[in-house]
Amino acid sequence: MASTYSTPRWRTALLGGFLTTLPWLSSGMAGKTQADYFIKSLPGAPEPLLKMHAGHIEVDAEHNGNLFFWHYENRHIADRQRTVLWLNGGPGCSSMDGALMEVGPYRVQADGNLHYNNGSWDEFANLLFVDQPVGTGFSYVNTDSYLTELDQMANHMVIFLEKWFGLFPEYEHDDLYIAGESYAGQHIPYIARAIVKRNKEQGKTPWALKGLLIGNGWISPVDQYLSYIPYAYQNGLMKADSDMAKRVENQQRICIKKLEDGGMDAVDTNDCEQIMVNILEETKDRKADRMNQCVNMYDIRLRDDASCGMNWPPDLASVTPYLRRPDVIQALHINPDKKTGWQECNGAVSGHFRAKKSEPSVRFLPELIPEVPTLLFSGDKDFICNHIGTEEMIKNMQWSGGKGFEVTPGVWAPKQDWTFEGEAAGSWQEARNLTYVVFYNSSHMVPFDYPRRTRDMLDRFMGVDIEQIGGVPSDSRIDGEKGPLTSVGDHPNSTRAEEDKATDVKQAEWKAYYRSGQVALVVVVIVAALWGIFLWRSRRRHTKTAYQGDDGDEGRESLLTGMGLDNFRRKERRSDLEAADFDERELDDLDGASKKPGNGYASLGSEKERQSHNDSTFSLGGDSDDEAGSSDGPKRKGGSS
């Protein structure tokens, strides 16, 4: 770390011993203040800079478990303060996907510069991205201490939030929303349940958990497994009664037998995951050019090489080298002793996180919905966590005295048409605290495709009222009705530069923390300072050891034996890397010269360029139909090992 940081750290260390005497600050946070996390500059970012904080918070002192966060302050305040905690899936995939490819204020360009994301979720909400479980992304832990169960992960997140709100108390009373996608369909309900339980404990300041948002979520494994064949038929990937279909249906029978033999409560079942793997393998067109052989499991409109989606999304080719740049690592306050580069998904984390003792979140989601408003959303072109599985799950769930979207016995809430700026955007359906949104012509990562539409969804769900701040609302209608003015129209991202006066007030509040007790407790401070120096030095040595211990697994990720989800797309690439023994940083060159994706990747980059919905919502495009239709002949079987 640059020498300019030495003075603040020395000052922090002197205060460390004194601050540990404060009841709200645990020993793991001794010596840390907001100033240590403040991002003074960010390479490639446009001016003026957004207000951001980033760094590590310790959640497991015994095993040196630290979670990395990146926080953006909201650019405008509507009627109330809100914070959105965003989590990506995997398990073991970094939430920097969400920060730099989906809902965050910046997108990374090919030249390494950042540009504003027109549609970022920080318009009216503070955004908090966390790499979790420990070991994911920039987070770290001793390599013999990866988590294995969902309850462990949820407990770490509660510890993280306790300490984070201790550092940033001005956000503790915000309305809190937890959002994410994919395997976060397990993470989010588990974390929400832990927060609800914590809020009921005596002496705790309740956190205002106001809502959950889960996109293309892995919530009900059974419903997802049994959705693969219907989805393949509905979208022309496979023809009923074909030899291909018979082989895949045989795999489904094996899956059902496994489920009936005790697999109904498993978070992942390998024999059932094989259904999708077999469909992808059977539908490969090996006569096509290399980058157009396989359907992309994350967006069936696209095709990829034999990995069936691991080269997607295309922005990853720019994000990975950006997050490995030394100046970016320094700006984000990453421990300088960390020798391995950022990885989107960590196979060591997912390999340990088998959740064998955990029940699927669908088992208790019906108990959460009455307490916490919940929104599920699906991109209709995603295969791996497709909308059919989500809809089956909703239909089968019972909560608040009804089943599915019943409003009265036997009468279901209507599915409403949603239009955005004159285009058919999707459908809305809601009843008894649950909302379900389908995005037409969208992938596994809906905000990657439609950032502004997802922000409109978020603002509607949060009940944002922009009338107090002015601005022109976007033309968003549900069944033709505009409803409340909830989302601003199309404009480049503004910044909080003009609102720095409020920031100055907050900084003044923290100066008061530093001065607190300095006159009355001078002697205590001096004595405690010596102890703080000792802790500071020993912690630096301890951290260095932990990072070095983590090297063995970074960049050498074996084929997964269970649930893949976001990790699945990198199985083949990681098995190739496992045979090589070289420094992780050499991967920068590999990613910079990565293979070009197949048909459709470049043409789907702009929200305004998406094709509008028509009567054949769930059909493939012309090219994909032809390729899928020609693959009914005998194919080599394969799958994950």
Swiss-Prot record:
GO terms for cellular component: membrane; trans-Golgi network. Its main location: Golgi. The keyword Protease applies. It catalyses: Preferential release of a C-terminal arginine or lysine residue. It comes from the Eukaryota. SUPFAM superfamilies: alpha/beta-Hydrolases. The active site is at S182, D382, H444. Residues 1-35 form the signal peptide. InterPro entries: AB_hydrolase_fold, Peptidase_S10, Ser_caboxypep_ser_AS. GO terms for biological process: apoptotic process; proteolysis. It is a single-pass type I membrane protein. Residues 36-515 are lumenal. Coiled coil: none annotated. The chain crosses the membrane at residues 516-536. Residues 537-641 are cytoplasmic. It is found in: Golgi apparatus, trans-Golgi network membrane. Residues 472-502, 585-641 are annotated as: Disordered. Gene3D superfamilies: alpha/beta hydrolase (3.40.50.1820). Glycans are attached at N118, N433, N441, N493. Its EC number is 3.4.16.6. It is an enzyme of class 3 (hydrolase). Protease with a carboxypeptidase B-like function involved in the C-terminal processing of the lysine and arginine residues from protein precursors. Promotes cell fusion and is involved in the programmed cell death. This is Pheromone-processing carboxypeptidase KEX1. It comes from Leptosphaeria maculans (strain JN3 / isolate v23.1.3 / race Av1-4-5-6-7-8) (Blackleg fungus). The gene is KEX1.
